[in-house]
Amino acid sequence: MKITRSLSTVEVHTGGEAFRIVTSGLPRAPGDTIVQRRAWLKENADEIRRALMFEPRGHADMYGGYLTEPVSPNADFGVIFVHNEGYSDHCGHGVIALSTAAVELGWVQRTVPETRVGIDAPCGFIEAFVKWDGEHAGPVRFVNVPSFIWQRDVSVETPSFGTVTGDIAYGGAFYFYVDGAPFDLPVREAAVEKLIRFGAEVKAAANAKYPVVHPEIPEINHIYGTIIANAPRHPGSTQANCCVFADREVDRSPTGSGTGGRVAQLYQRGLLAAGDTLVNESIVGTVFKGRVLRETTVGDIPAVIPEVEGSAHICGFANWIVDERDPLTYGFLVR
């Protein structure tokens, strides 16, 4: 059998959200930064992303990451995040998945009771700490990038829901944060179609009306998704939220970068005190925890350094092939 390409992956989920780690088979991407390597792959090898994210190997809500060499002295490896629409700047559930895999599979030197993992991502360097008892990885906490409110109390007009008001905040990606209660949007599986329509309409309207540019990373220059908050199902949770991002993709986890942005938003609005913990619940009831480590600035913008905690589990290993004779080898999507 003659094949065009073979790709090896580790299959992980974080709070229910898939994360496919590509460990071999990728072309070597040139570049001194992760952003440069991402740009090269987007220009020269985007068909690999489509093959691994789209059906029949993936699905409309698939997510993954390409391992690459580190670009900073404290990192163990780098990652390029991929999804159904393209490439992202940050992925907190991906950081948790990568860190879990790195410790479970011995990609880093392991120490009891906690192992450090350094990751270079498009949004910058991220440091994670994984509980390790000598046999199994446990919860992961990571120090998020500086997070902040970009604009408060901004409004957009949507075709189906009218005027929607919320905050634009950054936690590794820009999100439009909004309360779902006024729009009868419970954060539950049964409401997913309405949540998707709402999130997609708000994201499109916000990107059209509010140009965003990260003060220090100009390549981060769009609103990645809508985060809709409402009441949780578990009494120990602070809130539930649903992130609709990329091309109408729904995060099954509570969204790591979104949790970082939410921590910044609540803290800067006086709704989360230093030392308090946000217990953030997902659409399927899984939980991330977030808290403020310290205050900082990004350019002239007041910001905080959040810590986000969650758990991931390896659920498989795979070898994928690309066969040019297959008319669907680079995938398709049916919603």
Swiss-Prot record:
Activity's dependence on pH: Optimum pH is 8.0-9.5.
Gene3D superfamilies with a match to the protein in the record: Diaminopimelate Epimerase, Chain A, domain 1
Residues reported to bind substrate: G92, H93, G256, S257
Induction: Induced by T3LHyp, D-proline and D-lysine, but not by trans-4-hydroxy-L-proline (T4LHyp) and L-proline.
Record key words, sorted: Lyase
Record note on quaternary structure: Homodimer.
Record's protein name: Trans-3-hydroxy-L-proline dehydratase
Organism expressing this protein natively: Azospirillum brasilense
This protein's encoding gene: lhpH
